[in-house]
């Protein structure tokens, strides 16, 4: 018999306080399995990839097709993930109420929905964008379902390090949509998302390690414990901050404004990483870092878009001109 009393986790918080409750956020079964909460950030990094390209801004129709196709591909990946993990979800208290393990939706209906979304995404991207963007979107879908979900997640604590490639593909899609190819700037944002992902996900895994342990999923906090996990979070957090600075050169214009606006984002990220390092078992700090890491990546993508505005280019020209005047007059000496 399952107790109706909320389970208490580390720090005296209930699971419902750590992870949003499905009872509070009611979604239709067909929408729930598409994991809509994950899609906005994927689309934001797609926009970031576009903003890094010479083809920015995109025509309205191509922009809409790129984002629509990306959302459909992400939804299909989410559904296929739920189908693959329905037995696992049924054994975890946090996920047992999801549409498939609870019986609110049949696997057949879910699979039909996933295939429909995949075909619609491919059609929209091929017809409204280009074949490269379509191919990269499908590669991201397959990477998430096959590489991460089926192969890496149940086998290695480094699953999210390697499997993070799936979440890092949207910037490549954006770059391909904007210019028809993926340049070095697109690969820079791909690498940044790859480095950001482990720290982001391990902060959440610290909160849910009891669930993962119960079903035998070898997440890093389960295998190595919170202290080692927090050290790894610190390494990836610092790597993310260092690589993020290269956006100054990755942007075709507006890089100086990006660099200045980036400083508070990186300072806050490092502060939260340091705070968690001082108390690896602290639930509030892990939860705070997880939430901030989401805001951080949204912020990076917003900065990339803002830095492509005409006023950002003007700011760069005036700033560099001022710096050159100061250098020539010896004011730096």
Curated annotation (Swiss-Prot):
<keyword id="KW-1003">Cell membrane</keyword>
<feature type="transmembrane region" description="Helical">
    <location>
        <begin position="160"/>
        <end position="180"/>
    </location>
</feature>
<keyword id="KW-0812">Transmembrane</keyword>
<comment type="function">
    <text>Converts heme B (protoheme IX) to heme O by substitution of the vinyl group on carbon 2 of heme B porphyrin ring with a hydroxyethyl farnesyl side group.</text>
</comment>
<dbReference type="Pfam" id="PF01040">
    <property type="entry name" value="UbiA"/>
</dbReference>
<feature type="transmembrane region" description="Helical">
    <location>
        <begin position="188"/>
        <end position="208"/>
    </location>
</feature>
<feature type="transmembrane region" description="Helical">
    <location>
        <begin position="245"/>
        <end position="265"/>
    </location>
</feature>
<dbReference type="InterPro" id="IPR044878">
    <property type="entry name" value="UbiA_sf"/>
</dbReference>
<keyword id="KW-0997">Cell inner membrane</keyword>
<keyword id="KW-0472">Membrane</keyword>
<dbReference type="InterPro" id="IPR006369">
    <property type="entry name" value="Protohaem_IX_farnesylTrfase"/>
</dbReference>
<dbReference type="GO" id="GO:0048034">
    <property type="term" value="P:heme O biosynthetic process"/>
</dbReference>
<keyword id="KW-1133">Transmembrane helix</keyword>
<dbReference type="GO" id="GO:0008495">
    <property type="term" value="F:protoheme IX farnesyltransferase activity"/>
</dbReference>
<feature type="transmembrane region" description="Helical">
    <location>
        <begin position="109"/>
        <end position="129"/>
    </location>
</feature>
<keyword id="KW-0350">Heme biosynthesis</keyword>
<dbReference type="InterPro" id="IPR030470">
    <property type="entry name" value="UbiA_prenylTrfase_CS"/>
</dbReference>
<protein>
    <recommendedName>
        <fullName>Protoheme IX farnesyltransferase</fullName>
        <ecNumber>2.5.1.141</ecNumber>
    </recommendedName>
</protein>
<feature type="transmembrane region" description="Helical">
    <location>
        <begin position="132"/>
        <end position="152"/>
    </location>
</feature>
<feature type="transmembrane region" description="Helical">
    <location>
        <begin position="63"/>
        <end position="83"/>
    </location>
</feature>
<feature type="transmembrane region" description="Helical">
    <location>
        <begin position="292"/>
        <end position="312"/>
    </location>
</feature>
<keyword id="KW-0808">Transferase</keyword>
<comment type="pathway">
    <text>Porphyrin-containing compound metabolism; heme O biosynthesis; heme O from protoheme: step 1/1.</text>
</comment>
<dbReference type="GO" id="GO:0005886">
    <property type="term" value="C:plasma membrane"/>
</dbReference>
<comment type="similarity">
    <text>Belongs to the UbiA prenyltransferase family. Protoheme IX farnesyltransferase subfamily.</text>
</comment>
<dbReference type="InterPro" id="IPR000537">
    <property type="entry name" value="UbiA_prenyltransferase"/>
</dbReference>
């Amino acid at each position: 018999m399952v107790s109706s009393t909320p389970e208490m986790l580390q720090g005296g918080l209930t699971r419902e306080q750590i992870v949003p409750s499905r009872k509070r956020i009611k979604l239709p079964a067909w929408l729930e399995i598409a994991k809509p909460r994950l899609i906005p950030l994927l689309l934001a990094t797609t926009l970031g990839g576009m903003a890094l390209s010479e083809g920015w801004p995109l025509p309205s129709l191509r922009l809409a097709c790129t984002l629509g196709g990306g959302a459909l591909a992400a939804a299909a990946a989410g559904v296929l993930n739920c189908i693959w993990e329905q037995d696992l979800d049924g054994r975890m208290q946090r996920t047992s109420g999801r549409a498939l393990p609870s019986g609110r939706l049949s696997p057949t209906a879910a699979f039909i929905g996933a295939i429909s979304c995949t075909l619609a995404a491919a059609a929209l991207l091929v017809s409204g964008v280009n074949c490269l963007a379509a191919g990269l979107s499908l590669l991201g879908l397959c990477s998430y379902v096959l590489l991460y979900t089926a192969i890496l997640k149940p086998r290695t604590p480094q699953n999210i390090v390697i499997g993070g490639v799936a979440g890092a593909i949207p910037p490549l899609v954006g770059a391909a949509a904007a210019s028809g190819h993926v340049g070095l700037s697109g690969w820079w944002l791909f690498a940044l998302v790859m480095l950001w992902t482990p720290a982001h996900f391990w902060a959440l895994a610290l909160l849910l390690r009891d669930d993962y342990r119960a079903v035998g999923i070898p997440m890093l906090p389960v295998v190595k414990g919170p202290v080692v996990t927090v050290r790894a979070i610190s390494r990836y957090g610092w790597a993310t901050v260092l690589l993020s600075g290269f956006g100054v050169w990755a942007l075709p214009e507006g890089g100086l404004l990006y660099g200045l606006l980036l400083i508070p984002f990186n300072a806050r990220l490092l502060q939260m990483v340091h705070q968690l390092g001082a108390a690896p078992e602290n639930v509030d700090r892990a939860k705070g870092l997880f939430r901030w890491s989401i805001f951080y990546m949204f912020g990076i993508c917003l900065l990339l878009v803002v830095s492509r505005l005409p006023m950002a280019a003007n700011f760069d020209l005036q700033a560099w001109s001022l710096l050159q005047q100061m250098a020539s007059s010896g004011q730096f000496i």
